[in-house]
């Protein structure tokens, strides 16, 4: 919803807002912010708030400006009612007022506009898993999960229930639209699902979701971890991304796989044909690759309606448009880059008329099906060699993202205790 400056001033006064967070994500999807006082809002809207971007946005070694996207106004509900805190997601500009080319949120918006010009409407949603761990007397995290519950368990086996409920209520109060939540397969493992919305809103929701989960978990005496594979013998935590693409108000994925349209087949083919190339962005940690192939986590580049382990799954339900779910990503990804990659890959498939091979029910064990990269090191190489990746993200972002990932790989190889290295980095 668009808010004029007058609307914002009235909202701030009526809700006793005393603090405004100007929020953005760094290159790797980590939430960053500068807080301003309400009296500075006019300057933020008209001139922008300057900040030193060195070290935060890897491709930038300069001062930049933050300007609020006023449509993203949201109250942070865990702060007191008196002296409330709100946040905006921000647009990034150079000091001369020109758009900053490394603004990944803007880049996703431009991809959305490109789809719209071609006659397509797109919505995206997420299902994101996380673990809750106990904390010690000092409030520091332990590696002890908060319960021994399993899939869809209820209390008393599910000791996450109250925390999960508070997270959902906070998300709803912020306007982030969670739909369902449950206990997952692992001890202390949870999942919260979001309603589909436009890709930019979905990425904003995912970016802020992690902050909300960690904040509410801490208030309940737990530590929330999005580490992709914290336990060797338990399910990992992934980020499943739903895409619903329409043309002429009809889903290109039909209402069942039997009426999957040629455009829908080409869109899926586009993603499958490029998935290896953008895995560095969707799975940017050493630990991400330990999750692949364990239980329901995909390891091969296949698609299906019926089985639960493909990379891309067709989703059909009564009264709903057909959609697809991309299943390999994890919460450490930058959602703006990852969502842009998925949309761009799918549209490239349509533009090139790419054919979708028939392996609807192929299992992960089928050696004839290509695999996802086996390591972050392999993913880096594939991204650097990819013409698709270079045409989708700015060269400076690719260079610095790859360099940072390579530093991570080098540090891992030098680590005396690889497991301790991963926990220190990703837990």
Residue spans of the language-model regions?
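Short, hydrophobic beta-strand segments
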Residues: 88-94, 190-196, 243
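Short, contiguous, pocket-lining structural segments
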Residues: 155, 159-163, 180-186, 198-209, ...
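A generic structural motif
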Residues: 26, 93-99, 156, 196-202, ...
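Flexible loop/turn segments at secondary-structure boundaries
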Residues: 27-32, 97, 132, 187, ...
């Amino acid at each position: 919803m668009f808010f004029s400056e007058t609307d914002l001033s009235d909202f701030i006064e009526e809700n006793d807002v005393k603090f405004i967070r100007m929020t953005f994500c760094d290159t790797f999807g980590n939430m960053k912010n500068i807080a301003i006082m309400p009296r500075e809002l006019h300057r933020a809207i008209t001139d922008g708030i300057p900040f030193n971007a060195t070290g935060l946005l890897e491709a930038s070694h300069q001062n930049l400006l933050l300007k609020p996207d006023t449509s993203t106004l949201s109250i942070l509900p865990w702060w007191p009612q008196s002296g409330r805190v709100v946040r905006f997601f921000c647009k990034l500009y150079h000091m001369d007022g020109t758009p900053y080319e490394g603004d990944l949120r803007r880049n996703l918006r431009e991809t959305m506009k490109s789809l719209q010009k071609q006659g397509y409407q797109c919505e995206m949603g997420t299902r994101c898993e996380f673990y809750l761990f106990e904390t010690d007397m000092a409030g520091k995290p332990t590696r002890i999960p908060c319960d021994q519950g399993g899939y869809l368990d209820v209390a008393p086996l599910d000791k996450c229930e109250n925390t999960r409920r508070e997270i959902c209520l906070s998300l709803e109060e912020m306007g982030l639209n969670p739909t369902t939540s449950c206990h997952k397969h692992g001890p202390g493992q949870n999942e919260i699902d979001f309603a589909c919305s436009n890709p930019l809103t979905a990425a904003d929701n995912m970016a802020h979701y992690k902050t909300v989960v960690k904040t509410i978990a801490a208030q309940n005496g737990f530590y929330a971890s999005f580490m992709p594979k914290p336990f060797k013998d338990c399910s990992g935590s992934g980020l499943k991304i739903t895409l619903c693409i329409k043309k002429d108000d009809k889903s290109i994925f039909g209402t069942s796989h039997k009426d999957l349209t040629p455009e829908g087949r080409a869109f899926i083919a586009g993603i499958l044909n490029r998935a290896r190339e953008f895995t560095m962005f969707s799975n940017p940690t050493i630990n991400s690759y330990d999750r692949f192939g364990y239980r329901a986590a995909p390891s091969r580049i296949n698609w299906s309606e019926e089985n639960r382990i493909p990379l891309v799954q067709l989703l059909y339900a009564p009264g709903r448009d057909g959609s697809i779910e991309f299943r390999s990503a994890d919460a450490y990804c930058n959602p703006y880059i990852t969502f842009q990659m998925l949309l761009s890959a799918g549209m490239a498939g349509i533009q090139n008329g790419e054919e979708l091979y028939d392996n609807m029910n192929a299992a992960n064990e089928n050696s004839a099906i290509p695999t996802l990269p086996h390591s972050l090191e392999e993913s880096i190489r594939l991204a650097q060699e990819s013409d698709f990746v270079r045409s989708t993200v700015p060269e400076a972002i690719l260079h610095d993202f790859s360099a940072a990932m390579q530093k991570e790989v080098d540090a891992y190889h030098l680590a005396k205790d690889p497991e301790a290295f991963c926990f220190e980095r990703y837990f």
